[in-house]
Amino acid sequence: MTKLIFMGTPDFSATVLKGLLESDQYEVLAVVTQPDRAVGRKKEIRITPVKEVALSYGLPIYQPEKLSGSPEMEAIMNLGADGIVTVAFGQFLPSKLLARMNFVVNVHASLLPKHRGGAPIHYALIQGDKETGVTIMETVKEMDAGDMISRRSIPITDEDNVGTLFEKLAIVGRDLLLDTLPAYLSGDIQPEAQDPSQVTFSPNIRPEEERLDWNMTNRQLFNQIRGMNPWPVAHTLWQGERFKIYEAELADGEGQPGEILEIGKRQLLVATGEGALVLKTVQPAGKPKMTISDFLNGAGRNLAVGDKFGN
């Protein structure tokens, strides 16, 4: 039985961890995840999804603020593990740790070499990719630059957003790792180097990238909105305050960018640089997330055709 250390943080990682724990080929000796964080206005302490799984299985848990040079790293190196599996861990692994293991592999939510970085699912949607997938690769010091062990793709539909793709790709990643790892460890798979000419980067979304520019086409804005749903959420301005848009649909229409073209009982049509969008799910400042009909019956009841979103 192969002895592993698992490193990961979000729900995506937790799905893969469960797959390894349910397999009879691997023994997970310990889990390494990010420290507990205070979140929200009430600053409530929240543990990571990976920690939740580890606690339910009674696994040893390490949560270093920084792995390099930490007492936790020394303890990890002395566990006698054969290797490490990382999935959206959120920290670089020190060279000293990489050198100690027989293997270190990473599960990455893109079809490498495209979309290296921390937000591959977001950018696959924002850039209008027709497909995405998961790559299993060898871990090296450079971010997401290791040789590729295996890849598996899935189509992206107009109904997808970050949330749906996270769920789909977590299952793909779990299954691909379980399908691939035995052959890789036995030497039956020869990893393939990434083509440097095809490398693109998808770093974490910056706050300024969340704002909608109504001069863009309806397709570009549609992709931005779903590429940030359910987080960090695209927004515009309404009455000088932030107005979040979770969901929209493509539509025909012509007017000044950001102009309201039509108001119905359950519909709000807004012009873009080319075409229009029907807003479906929104969140005005200081209000909860709501359907467009609830908005039009409440905070937005005084909206009029010709009013504009944005600056």
Curated annotation (Swiss-Prot):
Q: Which GO terms describe its molecular function?
A: methionyl-tRNA formyltransferase activity
Keyword set for this entry? Protein biosynthesis, Transferase
What Enzyme Commission number(s) appear in the record? Answer: 2.1.2.9
The record's catalysed reaction(s) read: L-methionyl-tRNA(fMet) + (6R)-10-formyltetrahydrofolate = N-formyl-L-methionyl-tRNA(fMet) + (6S)-5,6,7,8-tetrahydrofolate + H(+)
Identify the Pfam families for this entry: Formyl_trans_C (PF02911), Formyl_trans_N (PF00551)
Return the SUPFAM superfamilies for the record: FMT C-terminal domain-like, Formyltransferase
- Report TM segments: none
GO cellular component terms listed in the entry, alphabetical order: cytosol
Tell me which residues bind (6S)-5,6,7,8-tetrahydrofolate.
S110, L111, L112, P113
| Coiled coil spans | none
Q: What role does it play?
A: Attaches a formyl group to the free amino group of methionyl-tRNA(fMet). The formyl group appears to play a dual role in the initiator identity of N-formylmethionyl-tRNA by promoting its recognition by IF2 and preventing the misappropriation of this tRNA by the elongation apparatus.
Provide the protein name: Methionyl-tRNA formyltransferase
What organism is listed for this UniProt entry?
Answer: Streptococcus gordonii (strain Challis / ATCC 35105 / BCRC 15272 / CH1 / DL1 / V288)
